[in-house]
Protein backbone atom coordinates (compact mmCIF):
# COMPACT_ATOMS: atom_id res chain seq x y z
CA UNK A 1 0.00 0.00 0.00
CA UNK A 2 1.42 3.32 -1.05
CA UNK A 3 1.91 5.97 1.57
CA UNK A 4 2.22 9.62 0.63
CA UNK A 5 3.52 11.96 3.27
CA UNK A 6 0.68 14.23 4.34
CA UNK A 7 2.84 17.33 4.37
CA UNK A 8 4.33 16.55 0.98
CA UNK A 9 0.82 16.18 -0.39
CA UNK A 10 -0.07 19.57 1.08
CA UNK A 11 2.98 21.18 -0.47
CA UNK A 12 2.29 19.55 -3.82
CA UNK A 13 -1.17 21.09 -3.78
CA UNK A 14 0.31 24.47 -2.92
CA UNK A 15 2.76 24.21 -5.76
CA UNK A 16 0.10 23.03 -8.17
CA UNK A 17 1.76 21.04 -9.52
CA UNK A 18 27.92 9.07 -15.54
CA UNK A 19 31.58 9.99 -15.14
CA UNK A 20 34.66 10.03 -12.91
CA UNK A 21 35.33 12.76 -10.38
CA UNK A 22 36.83 15.71 -12.17
CA UNK A 23 34.64 15.47 -15.27
CA UNK A 24 31.23 16.94 -15.98
CA UNK A 25 28.46 14.46 -15.21
CA UNK A 26 25.64 16.43 -16.80
CA UNK A 27 25.04 16.22 -20.55
CA UNK A 28 25.05 19.73 -22.06
CA UNK A 29 21.57 19.26 -23.49
CA UNK A 30 20.11 18.32 -20.11
CA UNK A 31 18.28 21.28 -18.62
CA UNK A 32 17.18 19.53 -15.42
CA UNK A 33 18.01 21.31 -12.19
CA UNK A 34 20.83 19.60 -10.29
CA UNK A 35 20.73 19.40 -6.49
CA UNK A 36 23.94 18.32 -4.79
CA UNK A 37 23.14 16.29 -1.68
CA UNK A 38 26.00 16.67 0.82
CA UNK A 39 25.12 13.83 3.13
CA UNK A 40 25.58 10.10 3.74
CA UNK A 41 25.15 9.11 0.10
CA UNK A 42 22.06 8.02 -1.80
CA UNK A 43 20.89 4.45 -2.25
CA UNK A 44 20.44 3.43 -5.88
CA UNK A 45 18.15 0.67 -4.60
CA UNK A 46 15.68 3.18 -3.20
CA UNK A 47 16.09 6.09 -5.61
CA UNK A 48 15.55 5.80 -9.35
CA UNK A 49 18.98 5.61 -11.02
CA UNK A 50 17.77 7.95 -13.74
CA UNK A 51 17.54 10.68 -11.12
CA UNK A 52 21.10 10.11 -9.87
CA UNK A 53 24.35 11.53 -11.16
CA UNK A 54 27.71 10.00 -10.31
CA UNK A 55 29.23 11.82 -7.37
CA UNK A 56 32.06 11.24 -4.93
CA UNK A 57 32.74 9.88 -1.45
CA UNK A 58 35.06 12.23 0.45
CA UNK A 59 35.30 9.88 3.42
CA UNK A 60 36.62 6.85 1.55
CA UNK A 61 38.08 8.85 -1.37
CA UNK A 62 36.19 6.75 -3.85
CA UNK A 63 33.26 6.87 -6.23
CA UNK A 64 31.16 4.70 -3.91
CA UNK A 65 28.21 6.94 -3.03
CA UNK A 66 25.86 4.22 -1.80
CA UNK A 67 24.16 5.13 1.47
CA UNK A 68 25.05 3.00 4.51
CA UNK A 69 23.17 5.11 7.06
CA UNK A 70 19.76 6.15 5.54
CA UNK A 71 19.98 9.91 6.11
CA UNK A 72 20.91 10.99 2.58
CA UNK A 73 18.47 8.59 0.96
CA UNK A 74 15.67 9.87 3.15
CA UNK A 75 16.33 13.45 2.05
CA UNK A 76 16.56 12.34 -1.57
CA UNK A 77 13.21 10.53 -1.39
CA UNK A 78 11.51 13.72 -0.22
CA UNK A 79 12.83 15.51 -3.29
CA UNK A 80 12.42 12.93 -6.09
CA UNK A 81 10.33 10.22 -4.42
CA UNK A 82 10.74 6.47 -4.02
CA UNK A 83 8.42 4.09 -5.86
CA UNK A 84 9.00 1.07 -3.62
CA UNK A 85 8.22 3.14 -0.51
CA UNK A 86 5.18 4.72 -2.15
CA UNK A 87 6.58 8.23 -1.68
CA UNK A 88 5.82 10.96 -4.18
CA UNK A 89 8.65 13.47 -4.46
CA UNK A 90 8.15 17.21 -4.50
CA UNK A 91 10.39 17.71 -7.52
CA UNK A 92 10.57 14.32 -9.26
CA UNK A 93 12.25 15.62 -12.42
CA UNK A 94 15.39 17.07 -10.84
CA UNK A 95 18.76 15.33 -10.84
CA UNK A 96 20.50 14.50 -7.58
CA UNK A 97 24.25 14.54 -7.08
CA UNK A 98 25.40 12.48 -4.07
CA UNK A 99 28.50 13.90 -2.39
CA UNK A 100 29.30 11.82 0.68
CA UNK A 101 30.65 13.87 3.58
CA UNK A 102 29.84 11.42 6.38
CA UNK A 103 29.75 7.63 6.14
CA UNK A 104 29.83 4.42 8.14
CA UNK A 105 33.33 2.93 8.20
CA UNK A 106 34.09 -0.26 10.14
CA UNK A 107 30.72 0.02 11.82
CA UNK A 108 31.25 3.59 13.01
CA UNK A 109 29.72 6.78 11.62
CA UNK A 110 32.34 9.35 10.74
CA UNK A 111 31.85 12.96 11.73
CA UNK A 112 31.64 15.78 9.21
CA UNK A 113 34.91 17.71 9.07
CA UNK A 114 35.19 21.35 7.93
CA UNK A 115 37.79 20.36 5.34
CA UNK A 116 35.55 17.77 3.72
CA UNK A 117 32.48 20.01 3.87
CA UNK A 118 34.32 22.90 2.23
CA UNK A 119 35.81 20.70 -0.50
CA UNK A 120 32.44 19.17 -1.31
CA UNK A 121 30.94 22.64 -1.73
CA UNK A 122 33.73 23.74 -4.08
CA UNK A 123 33.44 20.54 -6.12
CA UNK A 124 29.65 20.77 -6.32
CA UNK A 125 30.16 24.14 -8.01
CA UNK A 126 33.33 23.67 -10.06
CA UNK A 127 33.26 20.01 -11.06
CA UNK A 128 29.64 18.93 -11.03
CA UNK A 129 27.75 22.09 -11.98
CA UNK A 130 25.16 21.96 -9.21
CA UNK A 131 22.39 24.56 -9.19
CA UNK A 132 21.46 23.97 -5.54
CA UNK A 133 23.47 22.48 -2.68
CA UNK A 134 21.42 20.77 0.03
CA UNK A 135 23.25 20.41 3.34
CA UNK A 136 21.00 18.53 5.76
CA UNK A 137 23.72 18.56 8.42
CA UNK A 138 26.27 20.98 9.81
CA UNK A 139 29.14 21.77 12.14
CA UNK A 140 28.97 23.78 15.36
CA UNK A 141 31.84 26.11 14.57
CA UNK A 142 32.33 29.01 12.17
CA UNK A 143 35.34 27.74 10.22
CA UNK A 144 37.05 30.01 7.72
CA UNK A 145 37.37 27.30 5.07
CA UNK A 146 33.65 26.54 5.13
CA UNK A 147 32.68 30.20 5.12
CA UNK A 148 34.89 30.88 2.09
CA UNK A 149 33.44 27.89 0.24
CA UNK A 150 29.92 29.14 0.92
CA UNK A 151 30.82 32.64 -0.28
CA UNK A 152 32.38 31.15 -3.41
CA UNK A 153 29.27 29.15 -4.23
CA UNK A 154 27.10 32.22 -3.74
CA UNK A 155 29.27 34.30 -6.09
CA UNK A 156 29.01 31.53 -8.68
CA UNK A 157 25.21 31.62 -8.52
CA UNK A 158 24.67 28.42 -6.54
CA UNK A 159 22.09 28.44 -3.75
CA UNK A 160 22.97 26.61 -0.53
CA UNK A 161 20.08 25.36 1.60
CA UNK A 162 20.91 23.95 5.01
CA UNK A 163 19.24 22.56 8.13
CA UNK A 164 19.50 24.76 11.23
CA UNK A 165 19.80 21.87 13.70
CA UNK A 166 17.75 19.85 16.16
CA UNK A 167 18.97 21.03 19.56
CA UNK A 168 15.89 23.05 20.42
CA UNK A 169 15.28 26.65 21.35
CA UNK A 170 18.67 27.19 22.97
CA UNK A 171 20.65 25.27 20.37
CA UNK A 172 23.97 26.68 19.21
CA UNK A 173 24.44 27.85 15.63
CA UNK A 174 24.98 25.21 12.97
CA UNK A 175 27.05 26.05 9.93
CA UNK A 176 26.56 26.57 7.06
CA UNK A 177 22.90 27.29 7.96
CA UNK A 178 23.88 30.22 10.21
CA UNK A 179 25.60 32.15 7.40
CA UNK A 180 23.50 35.04 6.11
CA UNK A 181 23.79 34.04 2.45
CA UNK A 182 22.67 30.47 3.16
CA UNK A 183 18.97 29.66 3.29
CA UNK A 184 18.59 28.17 6.76
CA UNK A 185 15.62 25.85 7.29
CA UNK A 186 13.82 25.00 10.52
CA UNK A 187 10.96 22.60 11.15
CA UNK A 188 7.28 23.10 11.89
CA UNK A 189 4.70 20.61 13.10
CA UNK A 190 1.24 19.68 11.82
CA UNK A 191 -0.30 22.59 13.73
CA UNK A 192 1.89 25.11 11.94
CA UNK A 193 4.05 25.77 15.00
CA UNK A 194 7.82 25.74 15.27
CA UNK A 195 8.94 22.24 16.23
CA UNK A 196 10.30 22.02 19.76
CA UNK A 197 13.56 20.53 18.51
CA UNK A 198 14.11 23.15 15.78
CA UNK A 199 16.72 25.80 16.53
CA UNK A 200 15.14 29.16 17.33
CA UNK A 201 18.23 31.33 17.38
CA UNK A 202 17.67 33.44 14.28
CA UNK A 203 19.36 31.06 11.84
CA UNK A 204 16.10 29.84 10.26
CA UNK A 205 14.92 31.78 7.22
CA UNK A 206 12.03 29.42 6.49
CA UNK A 207 10.16 26.59 8.15
CA UNK A 208 9.10 23.42 6.35
CA UNK A 209 7.59 20.07 7.40
CA UNK A 210 9.94 18.27 9.77
CA UNK A 211 7.67 16.05 11.86
CA UNK A 212 5.64 12.91 11.15
CA UNK A 213 7.37 12.47 7.82
CA UNK A 214 7.34 9.26 5.81
CA UNK A 215 10.44 8.73 3.72
CA UNK A 216 12.53 5.99 2.15
CA UNK A 217 15.25 3.94 3.79
CA UNK A 218 18.34 2.82 1.87
CA UNK A 219 16.59 -0.51 1.24
CA UNK A 220 13.62 1.22 -0.35
CA UNK A 221 11.28 0.66 2.58
CA UNK A 222 9.13 3.37 4.09
CA UNK A 223 9.91 4.68 7.56
CA UNK A 224 9.16 7.71 9.69
CA UNK A 225 11.55 10.30 11.09
CA UNK A 226 11.72 13.93 12.09
CA UNK A 227 14.25 16.72 11.91
CA UNK A 228 15.28 19.93 10.23
CA UNK A 229 17.28 17.80 7.78
CA UNK A 230 14.08 16.76 6.08
CA UNK A 231 12.60 20.24 6.23
CA UNK A 232 15.67 21.44 4.32
CA UNK A 233 15.03 18.82 1.63
CA UNK A 234 11.50 20.19 1.19
CA UNK A 235 12.86 23.70 0.62
CA UNK A 236 15.50 22.44 -1.81
CA UNK A 237 12.75 20.80 -3.83
CA UNK A 238 10.71 24.01 -3.84
CA UNK A 239 13.74 26.03 -4.93
CA UNK A 240 14.36 23.52 -7.73
CA UNK A 241 10.80 24.01 -8.99
CA UNK A 242 11.40 27.75 -9.14
CA UNK A 243 14.68 27.30 -11.02
CA UNK A 244 13.08 24.86 -13.44
CA UNK A 245 10.69 27.58 -14.58
CA UNK A 246 13.13 30.46 -14.09
CA UNK A 247 16.63 29.06 -14.76
CA UNK A 248 18.32 32.47 -14.71
CA UNK A 249 17.23 33.36 -11.19
CA UNK A 250 20.13 34.26 -8.90
CA UNK A 251 20.32 32.67 -5.42
CA UNK A 252 19.09 35.82 -3.71
CA UNK A 253 16.14 36.01 -6.12
CA UNK A 254 15.13 32.44 -5.35
CA UNK A 255 15.44 33.15 -1.65
CA UNK A 256 13.38 36.32 -1.90
CA UNK A 257 10.65 34.55 -3.87
CA UNK A 258 10.42 31.87 -1.20
CA UNK A 259 10.43 34.41 1.63
CA UNK A 260 7.81 36.62 -0.02
CA UNK A 261 5.42 33.71 -0.45
CA UNK A 262 5.95 32.17 2.97
CA UNK A 263 3.03 31.97 5.39
CA UNK A 264 3.99 34.33 8.19
CA UNK A 265 3.60 33.05 11.74
CA UNK A 266 4.65 34.56 15.04
CA UNK A 267 5.66 38.22 14.96
CA UNK A 268 4.86 40.03 11.67
CA UNK A 269 7.69 39.70 9.17
CA UNK A 270 10.95 37.99 10.06
CA UNK A 271 11.41 36.73 13.59
CA UNK A 272 14.02 34.73 15.51
CA UNK A 273 11.90 31.61 15.87
CA UNK A 274 10.36 31.12 12.43
CA UNK A 275 12.29 33.34 10.03
CA UNK A 276 9.94 34.53 7.28
CA UNK A 277 7.44 31.78 8.02
CA UNK A 278 6.28 28.48 6.56
CA UNK A 279 7.27 27.42 3.05
CA UNK A 280 4.46 28.05 0.59
CA UNK A 281 4.56 28.18 -3.18
CA UNK A 282 1.55 28.76 -5.39
CA UNK A 283 1.28 28.15 -9.10
CA UNK A 284 1.58 31.81 -10.21
CA UNK A 285 5.02 32.11 -8.61
CA UNK A 286 6.28 29.28 -10.79
CA UNK A 287 5.46 31.01 -14.05
Where are these regions (language model features)?
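Catalytic-core regions built around general acid/base machinery
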Residues: 142-160, 175
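C-terminal subdomain of the subtilisin-like protease fold in secreted/lumenal serine endopeptidases
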Residues: 130-135, 156, 181-184, 196, ...
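Catalytic-core environment of secreted peptidases
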Residues: 187-229, 266
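Sec-dependent signal peptide recognition
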Residues: 2-10
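Subtilisin-like serine protease catalytic core
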Residues: 25-35, 40-54, 62-113, 179-181, ...
Amino acid sequence: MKRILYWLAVLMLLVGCSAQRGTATIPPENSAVVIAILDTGISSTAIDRERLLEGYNYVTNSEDTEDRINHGTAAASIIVGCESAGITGLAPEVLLLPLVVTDKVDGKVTGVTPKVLAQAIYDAVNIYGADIINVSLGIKKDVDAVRKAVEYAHKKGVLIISAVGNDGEDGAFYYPAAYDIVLGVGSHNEDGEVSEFSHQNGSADLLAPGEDIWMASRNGAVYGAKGTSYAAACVSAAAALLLTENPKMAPEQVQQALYTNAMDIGSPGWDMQSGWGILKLTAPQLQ
